[in-house]
């Protein structure tokens, strides 16, 4: 397959290079990724400002391009400017740290995959669970084998797969599970600190809350050493609540 690879950790981050090296053993790979780290930029795109694209050479077996923008910018430019056609598959990652539960809302990695989904390209976001000790080779080996058994052409437009891989040696993985995006979230707080001149600044902190009763919650699979595979959608309409609203306000809604 012709695979376009992007990320949010930056074009020369260890995760994306590990992923591209493994994929290039069996596929044609092109890397188009941000020239600087873009973690937690969500689905931002660059408007009314220029974007720069440059090819970089670090002696790899695949072409690498750096973009002065976000992961979503990279996907757009990768398809329209670099490849000039849709690839067979887009993979965003390997992210340093998980993208579980509400992480998905903020993640540049996941947004890169969703941008591919908008463009009609089968797309996958992949993350290594641990930020402190990400095992990229485990995730790279997994995705290479996963592509042998999973029909990526079955992924419908506007849908992407969000994959989270436990940070354990590859041989310790128990397999993969189909999961749901969980209600895993953070209880945020801000720590006040002093800058060198004595002024106040704030550092955002957070405690993880994992109390989702759903047995298919994504984080539960990862905790049990399974790879979590969650189909996610570009569209955010709460269909259940919409139906309840329609029933309640049917006579009052403007037609």
Curated annotation (Swiss-Prot):
Keyword Manganese among UniProt keywords: no
CC cofactor: a divalent metal cation
Record keywords, A-Z: Cytoplasm, Hydrolase, Metal-binding, Nucleotide-binding
Entry superkingdom: Bacteria
Endpoints of the signal sequence: none
Textual note on the cofactor: Binds 1 divalent metal cation per subunit.
GO molecular function per UniProt: 3'-nucleotidase activity; 5'-nucleotidase activity; exopolyphosphatase activity; metal ion binding; nucleotide binding
Localization per record: Cytoplasm
The reaction(s) this protein catalyses: a ribonucleoside 5'-phosphate + H2O = a ribonucleoside + phosphate
GO cellular component: cytoplasm
Binding site for a divalent metal cation: 8-9, 39, 95
Entry EC no(s): 3.1.3.5
Main location: cytoplasm
PANTHER family given in the database record: 5'-NUCLEOTIDASE SURE (PTHR30457), 5'_3'-NUCLEOTIDASE SURE (PTHR30457:SF12)
Function: Nucleotidase that shows phosphatase activity on nucleoside 5'-monophosphates.
Family the entry assigns: Belongs to the SurE nucleotidase family.
Protein name according to UniProt: 5'-nucleotidase SurE
Organism: Thermosipho melanesiensis (strain DSM 12029 / CIP 104789 / BI429)
Gene: surE
